[in-house]
């Protein structure tokens, strides 16, 4: 008898499809578009700072600032420097936030974009320093500030130094505000921990993308502490909008236009 030739299973490249975390459908990458929105349920996929820049600011208007700042690893935390180096190599980023200036339909602003691909955009000394310097620069140059937040919280490898960044950035936000300048925050998934407890919620206007997770501690931690069952979806942008913690939920495709209008209305710089 002749042996039947085994049928070879074709290999499908990993990057060809993406599974939607919300509806669980397998989506052809090209169908997600530049905005990375699920065509089935309209879930907003998490995107990198580079992808965010491509869909949000005018052409080549972004001018990066405050690069090359490095953590001194204050606790000599085991394998921390190795983790930083590996993440930098993988993402092409120096740190969890990209800072600079950019234009939104001709409206110039100081801009920061946090990237959850970099150690979950945890806030350490470098993130704190870059954002603080951005606010100080914006105050000197009379520029509004726009920040896209995303974070898992404070960076545990830097201990109390990471927590100190909450007060440090908040003080810079206050000085910028005292100068009569506009500050806009856009909360993206997830915005949690010390970032939520400080500058993410200090904007003059607070926008959020649909279904963004926003909170300080996790649901289980809160329920264990208060010994109560919390409402379904209480840490989602829609719940926070209903209770007055967020000013508006804006579709990713509408963000650039919305930001430009707000900057123009609040005396943005041209």
Swiss-Prot record:
Cofactor(s) annotated in UniProt: Zn(2+)
Q: What molecular function terms (GO) are annotated for this protein?
A: acetyl-CoA carboxylase activity; ATP binding; carboxyl- or carbamoyltransferase activity; zinc ion binding
GO biological process annotations for this chain's record? fatty acid biosynthetic process; malonyl-CoA biosynthetic process
Domain CoA carboxyltransferase N-terminal: from-to ranges: 16-270
Q: Give the cofactor note.
A: Binds 1 zinc ion per subunit.
InterPro entries associated with the record:
AcCoA_carboxyl_beta (IPR034733), Acetyl_CoA_COase_Trfase_b_su (IPR000438), ClpP/crotonase-like_dom_sf (IPR029045), COA_CT_N (IPR011762)
Could you list this entry's UniProt keywords, alphabetically sorted. Answer: ATP-binding, Cytoplasm, Fatty acid biosynthesis, Fatty acid metabolism, Lipid biosynthesis, Lipid metabolism, Metal-binding, Nucleotide-binding, Transferase, Zinc, Zinc-finger
Q: What's a Pfam family this protein contains? A: Carboxyl_trans
Task: Name its pathway.
Answer: Lipid metabolism; malonyl-CoA biosynthesis; malonyl-CoA from acetyl-CoA: step 1/1
Where Zn(2+) binds, per the record, is at 20, 23, 38, 41
Its annotated compartments are: Cytoplasm
The record's annotation in NCBIfam families points to: accD
Record's subunit section: Acetyl-CoA carboxylase is a heterohexamer composed of biotin carboxyl carrier protein (AccB), biotin carboxylase (AccC) and two subunits each of ACCase subunit alpha (AccA) and ACCase subunit beta (AccD).
What protein does this entry describe?
Acetyl-coenzyme A carboxylase carboxyl transferase subunit beta
What organism does the UniProt record list as the source?
A: Streptococcus mutans serotype c (strain NN2025)
Q: Which gene encodes it?
A: accD
